[in-house]
Amino acid sequence: FAVGTESIAKTFSEALDTTKISDVLSK
């Protein structure tokens, strides 16, 4: 369970980073 949660958190973090990059590029 802990490992699964960590993976989800990592994926979520990467998703947020991608969103930030997209926002910067769109500006």
UniProtKB/Swiss-Prot annotation:
Its EC number is 2.7.2.3. It catalyses: (2R)-3-phosphoglycerate + ATP = (2R)-3-phospho-glyceroyl phosphate + ADP. Keywords: ATP-binding, Kinase, Nucleotide-binding, Transferase. Its cofactor is Mg(2+). GO terms for molecular function: ATP binding; phosphoglycerate kinase activity. Monomer. On the 2D-gel the determined pI of this protein is: 5.3, its MW is: 22.1 kDa. Belongs to the phosphoglycerate kinase family. This is Putative phosphoglycerate kinase. It comes from Pinus strobus. The lineage of its organism: Eukaryota, Viridiplantae, Streptophyta, Embryophyta, Tracheophyta.
